[in-house]
Structures are given as structure tokens and as C-alpha cells.
């Protein structure tokens, strides 16, 4: 429509016209019932005087404009003059099909009738960007509509800085320091919004200060599509229902924590684009992608078709690649910047995306950066077995455990690597089907993912460190993955042996540099291979083994807080209200896998002595079986004899289908002080994903430094087990 309460006040458009009383499309009272409205009073009569410099629109083009309005069920405005008071008014009318000789329009049912005695001045078409004036020569009029002679030409009065779009079905809430008003969004441009709102119960517009910013929240259904502070541009004078024009305060903001080193952005070839249904206008939108990374993308909008506003959330956006592949996600506009060559560059952050789709996007981008990189795509498992044996990742001891289950093991990995993106992802470095580097990551606990199976070997003719390339790409994968709610990742964990210099330099180095175990922690465990016994010794009097409960959590947390202050309890969900394994168990079961765990408390005279976490998984899911054994946290190392602990362990091993299982015992000194032998030690490295940006920046700095002695010094011990 043409009114005085639009974003044109912000842009000072000289072609702007106005009406009093707000939008004539307002056809519902506070009760929500349909009502006929009086025509709005037109105040700026001089604005319809056509200047000599106004561009002309010829009859043929006018005919096409009229027919397009009819095709889209659009409307135009009729500029009338009341003969009694010489006042100009505007009313809605809907154009009918036009042959080029005459224009016939039907009155809007929202308007009062009785315009037969008014003087017809102009037809006005507002396409959101410009106002077109059509001179009128009346041929016929009645209570249903009218017909005018098609003029030789119309005129364009002016052009707005930003196109305005009418909106329907978008709920608006305006808040300011306790004041609340609710209503609807009438229209918007890339510069501003126009809303019609009324105060909530017991509120008053007297409380609304237009000199201070207010927060505008827009809903499409139950979903928020915009919520940000805005400044006031204009408002109507009514104190019951107001039309208010608001301009967003921000042209850019950071959705995620800042990074020193961003993930690489690439230009995709063949070309790619995004498509979505605009959340405010409900129309299909397509934009070409300028560049893209795993965490976001940017597009270019022309001056006269800008529809992206910083802060706007698009819940169903599709990335189209090469005309065939479609990747769906939720995205948010985070900046809008004018380009020197014209148009506006808009950045969008990816807020959420399912794991399978994220893997496809990562693989596309990884291949652009390095054609040897493969991320979460189908893998030749025969090449994978060969790689694991060649790199000594499956050594003689591990193979002895796997040999009797090798057929199951092969099928397990085919399924895991091809059909289970919710649970696992992998990065490989390949050439001609041969694998030279590998790392994978799997969802090990309710909100914790475990990095494992990190191995590499030199690629013939390539002097760069393959392991560093794989690790670097895993970090790029992490960069976007950690932001996705659907990933269910609050913590990432990684086991490595203290003598393994490669991870100790990178992962352990970060812990030492941070010096804050609530950001990233290292806990040292003793590893012991424990034989499963068929017979069980009962616990002595006053000793008890029972399922872990909230009553035991205080003693556990107190012990761990005074020994480590790290993240172990949070990552393994050993807090006061453990959520358990039921959700993750079902996800694994859906994909044909086993994954579950239970926690038990070993007490003496009601005093906690140890917590035992019974982990179960398919054999070989982790090649070191770190998810198919028992973790033990000894809370009273001096008050727990080894023979008592073994009696408790023996009561829990009946769930395993193997002859022996790994024990991981914390603190690592317990076995040594109890004169019990063990094979090795493992660090459990854990990071709180809230601080993933710090780790990614640290690691990318480390992996981009050309270490002269990296190959010579680290590679020999790359994954010593």
C-alpha cells in the first residue's frame, strides 16, 4: 500500500505518499471479526503531480503489469476525491484481465461502498520498489467495480532504497523493559519492519519510549524467525492499536564465538545455490552462493531484490550443488554488507544440519581443498583392513582378540562406515583407492564423542606429513559439527598413551597451555587386561555392590574434584542426575549395533569406595576395546583391597562374551600401590565443546607450522600402542 508509516521514512524517499489511519487492509477488529473500514485519508496531494522527468511506462507494459496483478491475485489503489469535502482518499481494487483497451477493477469487499459520486484521479500500483501512477478516464462504475480507458502511458514517481514486501501470518511481539505488545507484521524491507500491535493486558503505550530501542520478535507458527533490538522510525498516534516502523540496530553479529583462524571458505564449481521459502513472505527464494565453509556461506543480493535481514532465521534452507545434490539445514543471516561492484553480500551461519548431510557437505568442501581427502563417504573396507594391518594399528595382540569374531567384525565396519552417520564419521587420505591416513569419531556417551583410530603412513611422492593433513581436516570437520544441536556433542574425548609423542604434543600440549581443567582435562588411567571368570566370590560382610544412585554422587564428585577438577564425570554423565544410556542404546540398536553402559557403586558400611562403569559394545567397535570393558574410579584407594575389588568385578563380567576385558583404573597409582601388575597407561583427554574454538585455533596453528623434524621425530611413534 501507500502510507506514511513505511521504511521510506528511514530512506527519505521523495516519491513517498501517505495516508492517515494506517493500512486499509486492516479488516479485523480486536474481536477478530471482519469489518468494513472507511477509506484512508490521503494527505500528500502534491506527491501525485507528475514531474516532467518521471519515467514513462508504455501501454503494452502497463497491460502486462495489470495482468500480472490479476494472475497473482494482487491489488492496486484507487485515488479518489470526496466531492463534499474535497478530501482525497485511497481504496483497494482488484484488476480483472486486461486486453489493452480498458482496465476493469472490482472493489475490495473490505471497503465501504458508495464511490459512484467520487471523482476518479489515478490508479496507483505499488510494487514494493516503485510507485506507478496511471491517469484515469472513467468509462463505467457501479457498486461492484469500475472500468477506465487504458491511457497511452503511466509514470513512475520514484524508487525506494529497498523493496518492501507485504506479509501474512507472521506474529509480532514488541518488548521494552517489561512492556509487551502483540500483533502482526504488515510488511518489511531489508531496512525495516512495519508492525501493527496492541499492548498486552494491563499494559499501555504510555510505557513505550520511542527514544529507546525495543526488541522485536517475529514468529512463523511456533518458530522464532527474528528476534533483535530495533530503533523506532515512525508510529501512528493511536493509543489502542499502533502501526510502528522499526529498523534493526545490527547489520552484523557473531552467532558463534570468535575465531582467530576460520575454516577455509571455498568457491564451488560447478556453481551452487541456496533455495528456501522466505519465512516472512512465504515465497520461494533462490540465491547463488559466493563462497561456503562447513559453518556458513555467503550470497549476493541485487539492490532491488533484497530479502535477507541480519538476525533472520531460515528453518528450511536447501543448498543445491551441481544441480543434483540437495543439502538441507537451518541457517541464520549474520551480516549484510554493501559491495563496491553493486548489490549486497549476505552471510548465513549454519545453525543445524543432520549428521549425514553435514558429512556430505564436509566431503565436498574437503575434496575442493585436497582431492585426496575423503570425509564420511563410502569406503573400500578391504583397503581399510590392509591399512590397519600395515600401520600396525591391528597388531598381533589385537588380532588375537578379533580373530574368532572376524566375520562379524568385517560386517560391523561395513555397516558403521556406510550407514551410520548419526553415530560415526571418518576422514581418510587416499590415492587410487589406497588409504594413507585415517581418523574416525564416534558418539560414545550421551553427549560425548570419542576420537579414535588415528593412524597414517607416508604417501609415495608426497613429502608432507599425512597424519597432520588428516588431523587438520578433522579439525575443519569439528569447526561446524560442534555447533549443531542434532550432533548431541557437549564433549569430545580421546585416549592416548603418555609415550605417544604425536598426540601428547598436540592434545596434551593444549591442556598444558590452557592450564584450566574445566576447559580441557587429562586423566591418567592404568590399563589391565582382566580374565573373565566363571565363578564368583561373594563380598565380605558390610560390603555391597549396587547400581549407582544420586546418593553416591556427592562422594564421587568430592573425590574427583580434589584429585583432578577435570571433565571426566560430566563427559561420562556421572553427575547427580545421570541420564543413562537408553536414548543412545536405541540409536545404536536402530543401526544394528550394541552400545550400553551401567554404573555401580561399591560401598563398605554405606561409604563409597569405588564406582564401576560397565561399558558394552560390539567387539571391535573400538579396536582397543575401550568401550567394551570396565572403567573403575577408586574413591578410597587406601580403603579398598584389591581382592575385594576383584570380587566386585567378577560379579559384573557375566555380560561379556569374551575371555578377557580391559580394565581402566583411576587413579592410575591404585594398581601399583596395591602391588598389582598392569600392561600400560592411557590418558583420557576431554574438552568442553563450548571452548572448541580455542582448541581449533591452537591446533591449526600447530598443524600449519612446518616442523622440520616432525616426520623424523614424531612419525616413528605416531601411534605406538
Regions found by a protein language model. Give the residues of each.
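Structured alpha-helical
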Residues: 1-438, 476-493, 499-534, 642-644, ...
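Conserved donor-binding loop and adjoining core beta-sheet/short helix segment
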Residues: 417-464, 602-640
Amino acid at each position: 500500500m501507500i502510507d506514511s508509516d513505511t521504511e521510506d521514512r528511514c530512506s527519505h524517499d521523495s516519491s513517498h505518499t501517505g495516508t492517515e489511519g494506517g493500512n486499509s487492509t486492516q479488516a479485523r477488529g480486536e474481536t477478530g471479526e471482519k469489518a468494513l473500514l472507511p477509506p484512508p485519508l490521503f494527505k500528500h496531494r502534491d506527491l501525485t503531480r507528475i514531474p516532467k522527468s518521471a519515467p514513462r511506462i508504455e501501454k503494452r507494459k502497463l497491460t502486462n503489469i495489470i495482468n500480472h496483478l490479476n494472475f497473482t491475485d494482487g491489488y492496486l489503489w484507487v485515488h479518489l476525491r470526496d466531492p463534499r469535502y474535497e478530501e482525497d482518499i485511497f481504496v483497494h481494487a482488484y484488476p480483472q484481465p486486461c486486453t489493452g483497451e480498458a482496465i476493469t477493477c472490482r472493489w475490495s469487499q473490505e471497503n465501504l461502498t458508495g464511490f459512484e459520486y467520487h471523482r476518479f484521479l489515478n490508479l496507483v500500483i505499488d510494487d514494493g520498489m516503485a510507485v506507478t501512477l496511471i491517469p484515469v478516464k472513467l468509462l463505467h462504475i457501479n457498486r461492484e467495480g469500475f472500468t477506465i480507458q487504458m491511457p497511452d502511458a503511466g509514470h513512475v514517481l520514484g524508487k525506494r532504497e529497498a523493496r518492501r514486501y507485504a506479509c501474512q501470518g507472521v506474529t509480532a511481539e514488541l518488548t521494552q523493559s517489561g512492556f509487551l505488545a502483540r500483533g502482526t507484521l504488515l510488511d518489511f524491507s531489508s531496512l525495516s519492519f512495519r508492525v501493527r500491535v496492541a499492548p498486552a493486558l494491563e499494559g499501555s503505550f504510555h510505557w513505550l519510549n520511542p527514544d529507546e530501542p525495543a526488541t522485536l520478535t517475529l514468529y512463523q507458527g511456533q518458530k522464532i524467525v527474528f528476534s533483535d533490538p530495533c530503533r523506532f522510525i515512525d508510529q501512528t498516534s493511536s493509543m489502542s492499536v499502533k502501526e510502528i516502523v522499526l529498523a534493526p540496530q545490527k547489520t552484523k553479529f557473531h552467532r558463534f564465538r570468535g575465531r582467530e583462524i576460520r575454516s577455509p571458505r571455498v568457491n564451488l564449481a560447478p556453481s551452487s545455490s541456496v533455495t528456501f521459502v522466505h519465512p516472512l513472505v512465504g515465497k520461494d527464494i533462490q540465491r547463488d552462493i559466493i563462497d561456503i565453509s562447513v559453518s556458513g556461506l555467503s550470497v549476493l543480493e541485487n539492490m532491488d531484490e533484497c530479502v535477507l535481514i541480519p538476525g533472520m532465521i531460515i528453518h528450511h534452507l536447501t543448498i543445491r550443488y551441481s544441480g543434483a545434490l540437495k543439502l538441507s539445514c537451518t541457517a541464520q543471516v549474520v551480516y549484510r554488507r554493501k559491495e563496491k561492484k553493486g548489490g549486497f553480500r549476505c552471510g548465513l551461519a549454519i545453525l543445524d544440519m543432520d549428521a549425514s548431510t553435514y558429512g556430505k557437505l564436509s566431503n565436498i568442501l574437503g575434496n575442493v581443498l585436497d582431492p585426496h581427502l575423503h570425509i564420511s563417504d563410502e569406503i573400500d573396507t578391504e583397503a581399510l583392513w590392509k591399512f590397519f594391518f600395515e600401520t600396525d594399528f591391528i597388531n598381533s595382540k589385537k588380532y588375537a582378540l578379533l580373530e574368532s569374531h572376524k566375520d562379524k567384525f568385517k560386517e560391523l565396519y561395513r555397516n558403521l562406515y556406510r550407514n551410520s552417520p548419526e553415530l560415526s564419521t571418518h576422514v581418510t587420505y587416499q590415492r587410487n583407492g589406497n588409504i594413507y591416513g585415517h581418523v574416525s569419531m564416534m558418539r560414545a556417551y550421551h553427549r560425548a564423542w570419542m576420537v579414535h583410530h588415528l593412524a597414517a603412513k607416508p604417501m609415495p611422492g608426497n613429502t608432507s606429513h599425512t597424519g597432520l593433513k588428516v588431523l587438520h581436516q578433522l579439525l575443519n570437520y569439528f569447526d561446524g559439527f560442534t555447533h549443531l544441536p542434532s550432533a548431541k556433542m557437549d564433549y569430545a574425548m580421546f585416549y592416548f598413551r603418555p609415550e605417544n609423542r604425536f598426540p601428547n604434543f598436540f592434545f596434551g600440549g593444549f591442556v598444558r597451555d590452557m592450564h584450566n581443567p574445566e576447559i580441557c582435562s587429562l586423566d591418567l588411567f592404568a590399563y589391565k587386561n582382566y580374565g573373565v571368570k566363571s565363578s564368583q566370590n561373594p563380598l565380605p560382610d558390610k560390603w555391597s555392590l549396587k547400581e549407582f544412585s544420586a546418593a553416591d554422587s556427592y562422594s564421587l564428585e568430592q573425590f574427583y574434584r580434589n584429585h583432578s577438577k577435570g571433565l571426566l564425570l560430566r563427559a561420562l554423565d556421572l553427575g547427580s542426575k545421570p541420564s543413562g544410556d537408553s536414548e543412545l542404546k536405541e540409536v545404536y540398536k536402530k543401526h544394528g549395533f550394541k552400545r550400553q553402559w551401567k554404573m555401580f557403586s561399591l560401598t563398605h558400611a554405606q561409604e563409597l569406595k569405588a564406582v564401576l562403569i560397565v561399558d558394552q559394545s560390539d567387539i571391535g567397535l573400538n579396536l582397543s576395546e575401550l568401550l567394551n570393558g570396565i572403567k573403575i574410579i577408586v574413591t578410597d584407594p587406601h580403603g579398598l583391597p584389591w581382592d575385594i575389588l576383584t570380587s566386585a568385578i567378577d560379579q559384573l563380567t557375566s555380560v561379556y562374551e569374551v575371555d578377557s576385558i580391559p580394565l581402566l583404573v583411576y587413579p592410575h597409582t591404585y594398581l601399583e600401590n596395591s602391588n598389582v601388575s598392569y600392561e600400560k597407561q592411557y590418558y583420557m583427554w576431554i574438552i568442553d565443546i563450548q571452548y572448541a574454538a580455542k582448541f581449533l585455533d591452537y591446533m591449526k596453528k600447530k598443524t600449519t607450522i612446518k616442523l622440520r623434524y616432525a616426520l623424523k621425530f614424531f612419525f616413528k611413534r605416531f601411534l605406538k600402542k
